Amino acid sequence: MLYHLLYPLHTTYSYFNVFRYITFRTIYAAITALIICFLLGPWLIRKLRELKMGQVIRDDGPEAHLSKQGTPTMGGVLIIFAVVVSTLLWANLTIDYVWLVLMVTLGYGLIGFADDYRKLTRQSSRGVSGKVRLACEVCIALLVSVVLYAKPGFNSTIAIPFFKTVLPDLGWGYIFLSTFIIVGAANAVNLTDGLDGLAIGPAITCFMTYLLFAYFAGNFKIASYLQIPGVAGVGELSIFCGAIVGAGIGFLWYNTYPAQVFMGDTGSLSLGGALGCLAIVTKQEILLAIVGGIFVLETFSVIFQVGWFKLSHGKRIFRMAPIHHHFELKGWAEPKVIVRFWIISILLALLAISTLKLR
């Protein structure tokens, strides 16, 4: 919005020319989202308490978590609001990729909101039926995948990290892969959101990484030099990523241990869905498995735990899944688990960025 209002004035006032630079708008998108979260955070927490929107804790979880009962949840609405407002203010809204990621963010946020609301009204840790929730997630992801596949100039190849000449073309099968990535990323972030700040930390590092890849992919000279797929217009998603990084840091101010508010499924599903969509649009689908390694680890710990439990007739691989609970039950303090997972996430982000040259 500001881009469209102020940049045209650069012919009269040269200092408005700064609005043409993605880097400038990305920085201020992050600052805007950060300020929104800082300013509205206390009000939202107070309002959630008044409405008795408190977290319902599972009885079969770690005993230490019982003290979290009643902590305000659904804080993800703050992240979504800050991201949407900041993106609309600073991005070039003629780029359809911007609207696409916003649609996924809002769509998955709405699914998470319905899930959170149902849990609160039932006073149960079970929300919307798993089948219904999955069906809604698949519908949104499938719609986005079809739109992208049908978009002129969008190709169905996938980039393999560390291999510059390996670009397999999946054809129409790309629709199914991209649908799987969006749905998988959303639920992976959702599974990780079990400790104070555990999900938002790695999410910030993931979006910072994709901020770089979106910027590089949107600049064909840089993309050609780095030998990564170039995508016209995708550089504007750097602004969206910047907004999420700013909102994430602002939210972490209130979500860090001991948390004053939880993002709930509203936040985790929207962040995960947006992350999956970014991986597809920037043509860095496989890279998500590296930079989002924490989310992958959490997901596979649940899959292996459930699978082995059924195959072995009641035996477990971990003391509890997702794996962050396993470390809690081993005696690790919650802040130690969180910070160590953050450290791993940062290292994985650096590894992902290194693929720009290691190819």
From Swiss-Prot:
Disulfide bridge positions per record: none
Q: Which GO terms describe its molecular function?
A: metal ion binding; phospho-N-acetylmuramoyl-pentapeptide-transferase activity; UDP-N-acetylmuramoyl-L-alanyl-D-glutamyl-meso-2,6-diaminopimelyl-D-alanyl-D-alanine:undecaprenyl-phosphate transferase activity
Cross-referenced Pfam families: Glycos_transf_4 (PF00953), MraY_sig1 (PF10555)
Catalysed conversion reaction: UDP-N-acetyl-alpha-D-muramoyl-L-alanyl-gamma-D-glutamyl-meso-2,6-diaminopimeloyl-D-alanyl-D-alanine + di-trans,octa-cis-undecaprenyl phosphate = di-trans,octa-cis-undecaprenyl diphospho-N-acetyl-alpha-D-muramoyl-L-alanyl-D-glutamyl-meso-2,6-diaminopimeloyl-D-alanyl-D-alanine + UMP
Q: Which InterPro entries match?
A: Glycosyl_transferase_4 (IPR000715), PNAcMuramoyl-5peptid_Trfase (IPR003524), PNAcMuramoyl-5peptid_Trfase_CS (IPR018480)
Enzyme superclass (EC) = transferase
* Location(s), subcellular: Cell inner membrane
Q: Which residues cross the membrane?
A: 26-46, 75-95, 97-117, 134-154, 166-186, 197-217, 233-253, 261-281, 286-306, 336-356
This protein's pathway reads: Cell wall biogenesis; peptidoglycan biosynthesis
Query: Keywords assigned by UniProt?
Result: Cell cycle, Cell division, Cell inner membrane, Cell membrane, Cell shape, Cell wall biogenesis/degradation, Magnesium, Membrane, Metal-binding, Peptidoglycan synthesis, Transferase, Transmembrane, Transmembrane helix
Q: What cofactor does this protein call for? A: Mg(2+)
Listed under GO cellular component are:
plasma membrane
Annotated membrane topology: Multi-pass membrane protein
Q: Where mainly found?
A: membrane
Q: Which GO terms describe its biological process?
A: cell division; cell wall organization; peptidoglycan biosynthetic process; regulation of cell shape
**Family to which the UniProt record says this protein belongs:** Belongs to the glycosyltransferase 4 family. MraY subfamily.
In terms of HAMAP family, this protein maps to: MraY
PANTHER family assigned:
PHOSPHO-N-ACETYLMURAMOYL-PENTAPEPTIDE-TRANSFERASE (PTHR22926), PHOSPHO-N-ACETYLMURAMOYL-PENTAPEPTIDE-TRANSFERASE HOMOLOG (PTHR22926:SF5)
User: What's the stated role of this polypeptide?
Assistant: Catalyzes the initial step of the lipid cycle reactions in the biosynthesis of the cell wall peptidoglycan: transfers peptidoglycan precursor phospho-MurNAc-pentapeptide from UDP-MurNAc-pentapeptide onto the lipid carrier undecaprenyl phosphate, yielding undecaprenyl-pyrophosphoryl-MurNAc-pentapeptide, known as lipid I.
Q: What is this protein called?
A: Phospho-N-acetylmuramoyl-pentapeptide-transferase
Source organism (scientific name): Syntrophus aciditrophicus (strain SB)
